[in-house]
Design a protein with these regions (language model features):
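Catalytic loop of short-chain dehydrogenase/reductase
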Residues: 127-152, 157-158, 162-165
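C-terminal helical subdomain
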Residues: 166-182, 186-227
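Substrate-binding pocket helix/loop in short-chain dehydrogenase/reductase
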Residues: 89-90, 97-99
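Conserved glycine-rich cofactor-binding loop
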Residues: 12-13
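Conserved glycine-rich Rossmann-like NAD(P)H-binding loop of the short-chain dehydrogenase/reductase
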Residues: 26-42
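The beta1-alpha1 cofactor-binding region of Rossmann-like NAD(H)/NADP(H)-dependent oxidoreductases
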Residues: 54-65, 95
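Active-site loop of short-chain dehydrogenase/reductase
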Residues: 4, 74-76, 89, 120-133, ...
Length: 227
């Protein structure tokens, strides 16, 4: 029997790398999607994952990603971890940069979610997980270009969950409230950042939840974070 496939869109260091390692260890065939796959070389060598050059804001590119994943086995899990962002005062922020952030962070989530849903509906089970942030529910000064795609992604996840839960497809949205530990850097304050390995464990646990008690929205933050 072919291994189940997990697609991670927006792959890079940090959370995506932790997910790739964990899912590989748990027996998944991992497919990593990124605009620049060269940066994934060491992770691919470590995990045996397939890296596919992908523009998540391009329908044809996302379709090609999932066609490549189809050749690896049946899709069981899709994680959208891509993020479009730009910051700056509302009177000064670059409109083109905001448009690109929306294309990557919200429209890209739709394209990945759509391709995943088609396959999981045909299979009759599986999970689609979206990575959000505190900006998914709260707009901060100077962050319109980040809040807009994150609000949009959350709305997408809500709509998909209400449509797909009754069809045995688990859709979940994660609010990452805080900074994820950067690779190779110690936080200035102990416990002030989220461990990417710990987040990955929560994603996997959510995927494996019994369908009598599915989560939709999961908030994750360091225990010292004020909220």
């Amino acid at each position: 029997m072919a291994s189940e496939v997990a697609v991670i869109a927006g792959a890079g260091a940090g959370l995506s790398a932790s997910l790739a390692r964990l899912l590989t260890k748990e027996g998944f065939r991992v497919v990593l999607a990124a605009r620049n796959t060269a940066k994934l070389a060491s992770l691919v060598e470590e995990t045996g994952a397939l890296a596919v050059e992908t523009d998540v804001a391009d329908p044809a590119s996302v379709a090609s990603l999932f066609e490549a994943a189809d050749k690896q086995g049946p899709l069981a899990l899709a994680v959208f971890n891509a993020s479009g962002r730009t910051r700056g005062p509302i009177a000064e922020v670059d409109p083109d940069a905001v448009k690109q952030a929306l294309l990557v962070g919200a429209y890209g989530g739709f394209l990945v979610g759509q391709q995943a849903a088609r396959r999981l509906l045909a299979r009759g089970s599986g999970s689609i997980l979206f990575t959000g942030a505190s900006a998914s529910i709260k707009g901060f000064p100077g962050s319109a270009g980040f809040a807009m795609p994150k609000f949009g992604l959350r709305g997408l996840a809500q709509s998909m969950a209400r449509e797909l839960f009754p069809k045995n497809i688990h859709v979940a949205h994660f609010i990452i409230d805080g900074q994820i530990e950067p690779v190779g850097k110690k936080p200035e304050r102990p416990d002030s950042q989220l461990s990417p390995d710990a987040i990955a464990q929560t994603y996997l646990a959510t995927h494996r939840q019994h369908r009598s008690a599915w989560s939709f929205e999961v908030e994750l933050r360091p225990w010292v974070e004020t909220f």
